Amino acid sequence: MPGNRPHYGRWPQHDFPPFKKLRPQSVTSRIQPGSDVIVCAEMDEQWGYVGAKSRQRWLFYAYDRLRKTVVAHVFGERTMATLGRLMSLLSPFDVVIWMTDGWPLYESRLKGKLHVISKRYTQRIERHNLNLRQHLARLGRKSLSFSKSVEQHDKVIGHYLNIKHYQ
């Protein structure tokens, strides 16, 4: 736009790539694997849906309590396979204490590690779940804004996590 003329009647110009071209990363670059230690990591899953509530889509992610940032995330069904994909993304990081809620698959997957199971110690990640629901309308439980495709659902939420936590 030349000068400081107002641009009435036109949409503001943004430099965002179209969502179809987005390739959001799944692991943070703020924490260096091997050199930085994650003292307390909270893990949780968050429910969403694509098209209809019967087509559930789960966001699994790990949250660093001290740095207040998401470490890694994956999308999928609420199964051991999805949790396994998240754990493989987290394997390069040195995590001292894992904190989760009472979902039984966490217990079996974190066997042999220092693991605290308590709703009290997952308050921060639960608050982060609420922040995600407030910031992204498509994660709302009762909303007219829902994702129409799995690809767009994953890219929009992944892009949000990239902007807020990974860069």
Swiss-Prot record:
The keyword Metal-binding does not apply. The keyword Plastid does not apply. One of its GO terms (molecular function) is DNA binding. Keywords: DNA recombination, Transposable element, Transposition. One of its GO terms (biological process) is DNA transposition. InterPro entries: Transposase_27, Transposase_27_IS1. Absolutely required for transposition of IS1. Belongs to the transposase 27 family. This is Insertion element IS1 2 protein InsB. It comes from Escherichia coli (strain K12). The lineage of its organism: Bacteria, Pseudomonadati, Pseudomonadota, Gammaproteobacteria, Enterobacterales. The gene is insB2.
